[in-house]
Amino acid sequence: MALLKGKQDQIIIPLAAELDADHGKLLTVRCEATIKRLPYDEAQDVFRAIQNRADNSGEPSDETLVSRYVLGWKMPGPDGTDVPFSDEALQEALQERGYRDALIEGVMTMLLGKKVMERLRQKN
């Protein structure tokens, strides 16, 4: 049991996967991911490893980060019902750029915090 109010081992982060659609349009799929929440020091270590990927043979890769920290999701399938979370479904999502980008952004939001991610978006 946590001593501090609001402390959680995992958090649900809303995502928006932007998928290429016909006629040059984008289809935005709203979904959410349950992400493992790390203690501050551990999150900083992971972020430093990401910054030093060139020195670490590309590790941790995006696939490693998503596989390690995404614990579940609420993701709509083609018929609108939720796709059950599984390793197979996760690997399929990682092969689609829009879902991949959304899941990576979710992991980065957990590592850096929502406010920092918002500031980074404003700069870009």
What role is predicted for each listed range?
Residues 8-18, 66-74:
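Short, hydrophobic/proline-enriched secondary-structure or compact coil segments at domain edges
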Residues 1-6:
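Short, solvent-exposed beta-strand/turn "edge" segments of beta-rich domains on protein surfaces
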